[in-house]
């Protein structure tokens, strides 16, 4: 973001708009893509999604104005709208019963990519110019190659299902009534709302906050962002397996509400403590999403794509809208006001108390 801001003379509000367009393009289409692939599975959908991402990266490297930049991030968002629901579905199906571990491994891959992104930008792009973003196309091409055996396995799975339709048509048990399912999903969406508003404040504006408050360089701020993103990767990796052992509800409860003390202290901390507290916040908050997604998938086991798309999409949408709103707040009231306000968002984790226990009852559908 600092490179785009400097090269194209963007305001904080325009930075927020870029994030909004990306997040909204992904969030609006993800549930639709998930529902579509629930009804019409396509074995090679993952490389199709990655192809959109590759084209978007190429355009990001050479965009010369805000509108071109917005179109580029929109294309990247379309790639995400295909990749996330489909990858989450395949992860669920291939988990072998260890759904939490499988979901965490899937999501930690994305988090690790996000963690390495700022570091690679600091090493490969910041010293040489924005056009070097095109180097990231290599990673997209590698990903497409890696997806080939996964797609072959998924094609075999789909062929197996077609030969044995009773696997699909047979009775599948749902843990809650329709009314309680809607209630539980509503609670989960409130938790996503809480988590991703605060995460948006860090992923979009943390570097600007550090530069403004502590006078660090752009490269130093990218390093500190990298530390935060590593924490999110670790938290994601831990959240799923712990949920398998102790229950999803308890992981959700501890991760979101447990981040509140750290978020409340961070606006008043020194640079060293800010880095430590941001690491703790990233670790706690990121452990929630694998548990939230699996809890929702287990509520509606016949709608894996729709649920994955809904929750990934809602998360992206909340983050996008939050980035735009927080950008305007930073322009009007200063960057520090963002963290003074967002510090209270993890307290919404209290609503986890109302989540039903999925082990209590099972209702056939």
Where are these regions (language model features)?
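Helix-to-loop junctions at the C-terminal end of transmembrane segments
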Residues: 29-41, 236-247, 330-331
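Structural signature of the two symmetry-related core transmembrane helices
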Residues: 44-59, 250-264, 343
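Cytoplasmic helix-loop-helix junction between adjacent transmembrane helices
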Residues: 72-109
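C-terminal transmembrane helical hairpin of 12-TM major facilitator-type secondary transporters
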Residues: 243-292
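Extracytoplasmic gate region of multi-pass secondary transporters
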Residues: 181-229, 233
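Residue-level signature of mid-helix packing/kink "hotspots" within the transmembrane helices
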Residues: 23-31, 114-115, 229-237, 319-320
